[in-house]
UniProtKB/Swiss-Prot annotation:
Family: Belongs to the HscB family.
InterPro entries with a match to the protein in the record: DnaJ_domain, HscB, HscB_C_sf, HscB_oligo_C, J_dom_sf
Organism: Pseudomonas syringae pv. tomato (strain ATCC BAA-871 / DC3000)
Native organism taxonomy: Bacteria, Pseudomonadati, Pseudomonadota, Gammaproteobacteria, Pseudomonadales
BP-aspect Gene Ontology terms: [2Fe-2S] cluster assembly; protein complex oligomerization; protein folding
Subunit structure: Interacts with HscA and stimulates its ATPase activity.
GO MF annotation, one: ATPase activator activity
Key words of the record: Chaperone
Domain of life the protein comes from: Bacteria
Domain (J) ranges: 5-77
Protein's recorded name: Co-chaperone protein HscB homolog
GO CC annotations, alphabetized: iron-sulfur cluster transfer complex
Chain's role: Co-chaperone involved in the maturation of iron-sulfur cluster-containing proteins. Seems to help targeting proteins to be folded toward HscA.
Length: 173
């Protein structure tokens, strides 16, 4: 992992539960201070450093504002990088994934905007439950494997949520 720590950049304790409004406010404050345009008349070295600080800040913000990315980052901070691609040995979740994808495909085939809205609400509830479960166990070494499983589920639901938003946009047109 690169330094500095994403949480330290925002003067936050490394925790899963964050106040996203506070994070966004702090991001805007910090971004104003390191924005490369403020260093347009500075020597080239200072311009480059400002660009690097701005890029680091943006990366940190994107990581911390996304629950799945924040979960992966916290797990990595605790000692082990979690591989991006890994075979999932979670038959129950694999079945759930297949069912959710089939449901979404049916909604697309039927062009059912109301059904998509319901699906989206159910997905949000599932994401919130996963977030709460992860928050309760991520920092416990004895539950490391469970935390990784939850993080992978979070990643899947996040990707599915993105697909739902894309479907909504297509059906709205």
């Amino acid at each position: 992992m690169g330094s500095p720590c994403h949480f330290a950049l925002f003067e936050l304790k490394p925790e899963f539960q964050l106040d996203l409004d506070q994070l966004a406010t702090r991001y805007r404050e910090l971004a104003r201070n390191v924005h490369p345009d403020r260093f347009a008349d500075a020597p080239e070295r200072e311009q480059r450093l400002a660009l690097e600080r701005s890029a680091s800040l943006n990366e940190a913000y994107q990581t911390l504002k996304s629950p799945p990315k924040r979960a992966r980052y916290l797990l990595a901070m605790n000692g082990n990088e979690v591989p991006l691609e890994v075979t999932v040995h979670d038959p129950e979740f694999l079945l759930q994934q297949m069912q959710l994808r089939e449901d979404l495909e049916d909604l697309q085939d039927e062009a059912d905007l109301a059904g998509v809205a319901t699906f989206k609400r159910q997905l949000k509830v599932a994401q919130d439950e996963l977030n709460q479960s992860f928050a309760a166990c991520w920092n416990d070494a004895a539950q490391r494997e469970h935390a990784e499983k939850l993080m992978r589920r979070m990643q899947f639901l996040d990707k599915l949520s993105h697909e739902v938003r894309q479907l909504e946009e297509r059906l709205d047109d």
